[in-house]
Amino acid sequence: MALNLQDKQAIVAEVSEVAKGALSAVVADSRGVTVDKMTELRKAGREAGVYMRVVRNTLLRRVVEGTQFECLKDTFVGPTLIAYSMEHPGAAARLFKEFAKANAKFEVKAAAFEGELIPAAQIDRLATLPTYEEALARLMSTMKEAAAGKLVRTLAAVRDAKEAA
């Protein structure tokens, strides 16, 4: 479908606005995936706080210009589906990774996080980032274990002191 200049400008403005508030971006090729499967992916994306859109490569290059996602420019070849994680940096990567497992034709091209390009082979780095709640739980369990260990060492020192006396 041919887009006039105003439509192109509107697309660039909309996606640029989303990119400004995004934590990470993931680029994929969805050729060969059925419409039903893509609809499921979009629904799961909305629930996970992920903005997804198929955008022409020339327009996408304009969108990422001057942003932390500029490193993705070289991956804009062929049909490009871009997903921006709005709430958690690993949300889009996790979503695409799970979807790619179930759909062989879906191919993750690359991701970007804090200005760093993450190739498709290393997408797990981003997908396995813990959520805020998970990170907090890990920290609390580590602190709890450290306190218990200190108590045990203190009691052992008191016991040793009593035995020596």
Swiss-Prot record:
Q: Which GO terms describe its cellular component?
A: large ribosomal subunit
SUPFAM superfamilies according to UniProt: Ribosomal protein L10-like
Q: Name one GO biological process term.
A: translation
Provide the GO MF annotations for this entry.
Answer: large ribosomal subunit rRNA binding; structural constituent of ribosome
Which Pfam family, giving just one, matches this sequence?
Ribosomal_L10
Q: Where is the signal peptide?
A: none
Give the keywords, sorted.
Ribonucleoprotein, Ribosomal protein, RNA-binding, rRNA-binding
Keyword Transferase in record: no
Question: Subunit structure of this entry?
Answer: Part of the ribosomal stalk of the 50S ribosomal subunit. The N-terminus interacts with L11 and the large rRNA to form the base of the stalk. The C-terminus forms an elongated spine to which L12 dimers bind in a sequential fashion forming a multimeric L10(L12)X complex.
The similarity annotation says: Belongs to the universal ribosomal protein uL10 family.
Query: What is the purpose of this protein?
Result: Forms part of the ribosomal stalk, playing a central role in the interaction of the ribosome with GTP-bound translation factors.
- The protein depicted here goes by the name Large ribosomal subunit protein uL10
Protein species of origin: Pectobacterium carotovorum subsp. carotovorum (strain PC1)
